[in-house]
């Protein structure tokens, strides 16, 4: 390959004289071929001129230094060259490490939760939309960015025109902007308990199991989403998401579980897939209410549930309403007092509902018929359960149960709890 030599200035060239002396002449370096320059360099370093005395070798040393510092060999203009520096940090670090440095995610501020404002830069996937073989010069490589065969002939390496290359680059930039715009769009989701709360939202059925079992008749509802932090010696204050969900099929089978992850969607997935493996079966009276009134205390949470007739509805805490719909309970009254911690409330509710006594169990334990008095039937009792064994002859003693009464219930039963607006007379309209 022929090479051309460019010089910054003029360089003294050595010529031989008749008297054995060396003369200096100023010649343009453009007139010297590259081979002669390389020959002069080799002569100065290894030839017979190096054997001269120190007084006469000074001009040759300056010539060698000028050749090494002021000369550069350029390649022809039709060839491309790419700078390669193996010692640069760009070639030693991964893309994630470079993004951490650009976004300042490796300092103490990121560990302490700083930098949450909107001015913070966001990470972009620069590889998205790129095609192997595409570059800024617009070369067409068969098998990479163009087909190998076209119209029955094998294509050769070609290059796009300048206008075509500008159009391709503009299309790529426009496509990336559309992706960013779609990413920023917020999809309107189902309303939960309140406007901007995760509570009460549906996550759909759990994922199919490894053996192929599906849970299409189950539904998952979010009860609580919390940010929790743990202090570690290596990372400092580490943030994670804790999610409490409940699942149920509306036919008595329901359960709950907790999922924790650094990403919110991962926590949702873990919680709903774990809850389906910890199910309770809740007995229901005529598939609409509980069998009897329940009063329980779980830790510092007090829950009092009452059986109600059909059409009463659910008048409870909003989390209890969500869980009862997943179970299949349609009519019930519940009052929560004390702590309203969501985890304690959920555990206490499942603890009480799973331990209720059915009418058949009560009849077998007492050895008597269990009857129900309904308002629409008058004084006629309705038998709802009979003992499987022998019927007991002596009736149940009429003893006053030793239970702690609620003062609010006593006032309601005695008519002492009245609304201040009950006797208000309104003007006729």
Curated annotation (Swiss-Prot):
It is found in: Mitochondrion. Residues 111-125 have a biased composition (Basic residues). The keyword Ribonucleoprotein applies. PROSITE patterns: RIBOSOMAL_S5, S5_DSRBD. Keywords: Mitochondrion, Ribonucleoprotein, Ribosomal protein. It comes from the Eukaryota. Residues 218-282 form the S5 DRBM domain. One of its GO terms (molecular function) is RNA binding. PANTHER family: MITOCHONDRIAL RIBOSOMAL PROTEIN S5. Component of the mitochondrial ribosome small subunit (28S) which comprises a 12S rRNA and about 30 distinct proteins. This is Small ribosomal subunit protein uS5m. It comes from Pongo abelii.
């Amino acid at each position: 390959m022929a090479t051309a030599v460019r010089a910054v200035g003029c360089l003294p060239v050595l010529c031989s004289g008749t008297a054995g002396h060396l003369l200096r002449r100023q010649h343009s370096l453009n007139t010297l071929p590259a081979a002669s320059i390389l020959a002069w360099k080799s002569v100065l370093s290894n030839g017979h001129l190096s054997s001269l005395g120190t007084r006469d070798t000074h001009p040759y040393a300056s010539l060698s230094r000028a050749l090494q510092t002021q000369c550069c060999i350029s390649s022809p203009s039709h060839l491309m060259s790419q700078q390669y520096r193996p010692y640069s940090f760009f070639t030693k670090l991964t893309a994630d490490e470079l993004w951490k440095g650009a976004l300042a995610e490796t300092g103490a501020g990121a560990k302490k939760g700083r930098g949450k404002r909107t001015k913070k830069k966001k990470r972009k996937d620069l590889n998205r939309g790129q095609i192997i073989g595409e570059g800024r010069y617009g070369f067409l490589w068969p098998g990479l960015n163009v087909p190998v065969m076209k119209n029955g002939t094998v294509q050769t390496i070609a290059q796009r025109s300048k206008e075509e290359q500008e159009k391709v680059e503009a299309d790529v930039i426009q496509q990336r902007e559309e992706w960013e715009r779609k990413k920023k769009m917020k999809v309107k989701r189902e309303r939960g308990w309140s406007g901007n709360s995760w509570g009460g939202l549906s996550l759909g059925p759990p994922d199919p199991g490894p053996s192929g079992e599906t849970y299409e008749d189950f539904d998952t509802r979010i009860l609580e989403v919390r940010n929790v932090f743990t202090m570690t010696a290596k990372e400092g204050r580490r943030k994670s998401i804790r999610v409490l969900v409940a699942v149920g099929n509306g036919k008595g089978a329901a359960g709950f579980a907790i999922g924790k992850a650094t990403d919110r969607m991962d926590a949702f997935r873990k919680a709903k897939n774990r809850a389906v493996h910890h199910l309770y079966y809740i007995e229901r009276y005529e598939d609409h209410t509980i069998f009897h009134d329940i009063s329980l205390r779980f830790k510092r949470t007090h829950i009092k549930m009452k059986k109600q007739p059909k059409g009463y509805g659910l008048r409870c805490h909003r989390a209890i309403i969500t869980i009862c719909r997943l179970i299949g309970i349609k009519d019930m009254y519940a009052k929560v007092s004390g702590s309203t911690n969501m985890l304690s409330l959920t555990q206490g509710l499942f603890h009480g509902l799973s331990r209720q006594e059915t009418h058949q169990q009560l009849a077998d334990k007492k050895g008597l018929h269990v009857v129900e008095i309904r308002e629409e039937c008058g004084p006629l009792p309705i038998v709802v359960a009979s003992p499987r064994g022998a019927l007991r002859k002596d009736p149940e003693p009429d003893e006053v149960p030793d239970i702690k009464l609620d003062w609010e219930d006593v006032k309601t039963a005695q008519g002492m709890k009245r609304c201040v607006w009950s006797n208000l007379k309104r003007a006729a309209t």
